[in-house]
Design a protein with these regions (language model features):
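Active-site-adjacent beta->alpha loops and helix N-cap segments on the catalytic face
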Residues: 133-142
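Polysaccharide-binding and catalytic clefts of secreted carbohydrate-active enzymes
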Residues: 1-119
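Substrate-binding cleft of secreted/luminal carbohydrate-active enzymes
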Residues: 108-134, 148-185
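Hydrophobic, Leu/Ile/Phe/Ala-enriched alpha-helical segments that form helix-helix packing faces
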Residues: 64-68, 145, 149, 183
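Active-site clefts of carbohydrate-active enzymes
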Residues: 74-99, 141-179
């Protein structure tokens, strides 16, 4: 269904790109498991449930890319994922971060696979953190995503809305200008 809708949009409208924000499994809610046990068992998959979930997401990303490129090869396809693919402690390719949730492990989105396979033309990681954040440092993630783009475009997503928060780092009027300087280096 989703692939057909996107193909229809690309065919009928003069769009430059299809941009998907947060396309993967829902963010975890406490200890409540995602209710897909029946679908997993019915699938008969020999994959672990985590790998099966990633495979489901991978399949639709690949199919969307194929539909877009078949219809109008010049239309771009991009994703705006959560800021952390995986933590370094869990994977040697991961970022130097201490995120409680990651794309790969909790949202079942293997962004690096999509970039490497060319299924997406660009990535817009949601780097809604502050510079020197002790858990997920903005500047480290800018460098990490740039180094793991596989030749695809990287457009950093800024958390401008955070300027209104009470967090002391976001009260600094130079936080966003300094982030922009980091991205431009």
């Amino acid at each position: 269904f989703v692939v057909n809708v996107i193909e229809d949009i690309v065919r009928r409208y003069d769009v430059d790109a299809i941009h998907m924000d947060d396309y993967f499994y829902p963010y975890p809610v406490g200890n409540t498991p995602f209710p897909d046990e029946y679908a997993y068992r019915k699938s008969g998959s020999h994959l672990s449930k985590d790998d099966w979930r990633r495979s489901n997401v991978d399949s639709i990303i690949k199919d969307i890319n194929i539909a877009i490129k078949k219809t109008k090869p010049y239309v771009k396809f991009g994703i705006s994922p959560f800021s952390v693919w995986r933590n370094l402690k869990d994977d040697t390719q991961g970022s130097d971060s201490k995120a409680g949730i990651t794309n790969f492990d909790n949202l079942y989105a293997d962004i690096l696979l999509w970039l490497r396979k060319g299924w997406i033309d660009y990535v817009t990681p949601q780097l809604y953190r502050e510079i020197n954040d002790p858990l997920i440092a903005y500047e480290k993630l800018v460098d990490w995503w740039s180094a793991h783009s596989f030749g695809r475009h990287v457009y950093i997503g800024h958390g401008i809305y955070r300027a209104y928060e009470k967090n002391v780092n976001w009260k600094d009027p130079n936080q966003l200008p300094n982030q922009i300087k980091i991205v431009r280096k």
